[in-house]
Amino acid sequence: MSYSGERDQFAPNMALVPMVVEQTSRGERSYDIFSRLLKERIIFLTGQVEDHMANLITAQMLFLEAENPEKDIFLYINSPGGVITAGMSIYDTMQFIKPDVSTICMGQACSMGAFLLTAGAKGKRFCLPNSRVMIHQPLGGFQGQATDIEIHAKEILKVKSRMNELMAKHTGKSLEEIERDTERDRFLSADEAVEYGLVDSVFTRRD
């Protein structure tokens, strides 16, 4: 989880997107696969969390709320983490909208990805069996004059404190436990994530 907006090697390559063709009364209609899944109220959060991705995800959530404020939204997460401010815009939208947001981890949910995973509606947070979750404290990488570095250090400590409070709220852990466990990288299996309170259960297959 970074406090800077720099891209890294985890940025997704979205050049090749499968298309789905459906028959309608007016003939054939084609969608990219993600647009088709959006019709089923499924949103994908994959790759590094950054501003462009966050804008797309928040827009999709607001659109689905406008379509049906009573029906759940399903957020599938496979992310190594990313920029804190971008992630917090997704988090705040999840808490703001009326529909419950069910979160599902597939692959990995690390850093900001793990934070968003546990921010789903209580009882509706899931991991697939071989997924991995990692929690840690925010990362700082600011460079510049000493005074500016001091200002940014104070800001990142405030952000760290706020995120620990929110993580404690969503997991049911004490603030002291969260502070201790996020001091360094902590990796959890799907079952360990359930035990920790990050998610509610492990999905093995659909009913």
From Swiss-Prot:
Entry's localization field: Cytoplasm
Where does the record place the catalytic residues? 111 (nucleophile), 136
Q: Does the keyword Cell division apply?
A: no
Check the record and name the SUPFAM superfamilies matching this protein: ClpP/crotonase
Enzyme Commission number(s) from the entry: 3.4.21.92
> Which Gene Ontology terms describe the biological processes this protein takes part in?
protein quality control for misfolded or incompletely synthesized proteins
Q: Does the keyword Hydrolase apply?
A: yes
The alphabetized UniProt keywords are:
Cytoplasm, Hydrolase, Protease, Serine protease
Which NCBIfam families is this protein grouped with?
A: clpP, PRK00277.1, PRK12553.1
Per its database record, what is this protein's job? Cleaves peptides in various proteins in a process that requires ATP hydrolysis. Has a chymotrypsin-like activity. Plays a major role in the degradation of misfolded proteins.
Assigned protein family? Belongs to the peptidase S14 family.
Q: Which HAMAP family match?
A: ClpP (MF_00444)
Question: What PANTHER family does this protein's entry cite?
Answer: ATP-DEPENDENT CLP PROTEASE PROTEOLYTIC SUBUNIT
Subunit structure of this chain's protein = Fourteen ClpP subunits assemble into 2 heptameric rings which stack back to back to give a disk-like structure with a central cavity, resembling the structure of eukaryotic proteasomes.
What name does this protein carry? ATP-dependent Clp protease proteolytic subunit
Q: Name the source organism.
A: Yersinia enterocolitica serotype O:8 / biotype 1B (strain NCTC 13174 / 8081)
From the broadest rank down, the organism's phylogenetic lineage runs: Bacteria, Pseudomonadati, Pseudomonadota, Gammaproteobacteria, Enterobacterales
What gene codes for this chain? clpP
